Regions:
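N-terminal interaction/assembly modules
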Residues: 1-72, 79, 88-91
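Short, well-structured alpha-helical patches and their helix-loop capping segments
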Residues: 76-80, 97
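Single conserved hydrophobic/aromatic residue that forms the stacking wall/gate
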Residues: 95-103
Length: 103
């Protein structure tokens, strides 16, 4: 079985569970990694780094987003807010991408 999965979408789902529903990131992330065991090792590592890094740097990421957005982070829809957080984290703090096909 060669199912393809969008790791960024999975990261977004984890972040939404954590930020909007108060779930524990390690538990949600573990459940996702168990569900998608067929993912390549580099994809699993990227997913973990993206989720953990975005959560770890959330205050700084929100500050950067607020500097460039007309809409303040706190007023954004949760999906938009977390997509922007992940994007800023990748651009500013994460130096590698898992694969060109996951862009």
């Amino acid at each position: 079985m060669t199912d393809t999965v969008n790791t960024r979408r999975l990261a977004l789902d984890v972040l939404l569970e954590v930020t909007e529903h108060g779930a524990y990131s390690n538990q949600v992330l573990r459940a996702v990694l168990e569900k998608y065991q067929y993912m390549e090792k580099y994809e699993r590592a990227f997913l973990t780094r993206l989720v953990e890094g975005t959560i770890q740097h959330m205050i700084e990421l929100d500050y950067v987003i607020d500097q460039f957005s007309k809409v303040k982070v706190k007023k954004m829809k949760p999906v938009i807010r977390n997509i922007l957080r992940m994007g800023v984290y990748q651009i500013c703090l994460l130096y590698t991408s898992p694969s060109p096909r996951d862009s």
